[in-house]
């Protein structure tokens, strides 16, 4: 079989990943919940994973890393926890349901959002974004690349726009983490969410949030 669906999930994991899963099932206890060796071993594994992810993403500190079950959970937590009644968010028509469904749910609770559009080839129209900014706009939420068209977002342009307007920059990197380099400090990304089972070749049930809000934002 020729497998061409790696953007959905990588089917055949490297032997090292398979072995790591087996080792975790056989030797790892509950991290942070005891002082016996299996628990300490699990805590060391978790910290090592945080350090590895921080290095990969050029995060300032491993403490910026929080694990989740997948990108959907990570995005739900971020979107549900950062905004208040009456806040406004700018997002795009390219987003995955892991962004869209939480936003529609939050709209029922008073959140407002606007969509940035695309041209006839599905490419984002960056020059139109300034028209979407409102006095209560708090964040720009963008995908690194569309899961439908494969078109990528110019994160450098997105970052310049967000910083110019004092907005948080939240990036769904499910389609790009592991396949494209990401430097959260150079770009000024405040929140980055992704899954481990795609280009990172990890197992199902792995996800991550990187949270590093360094610039003052609108109040």
Where are these regions (language model features)?
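Pyridoxal 5′-phosphate
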Residues: 1-214
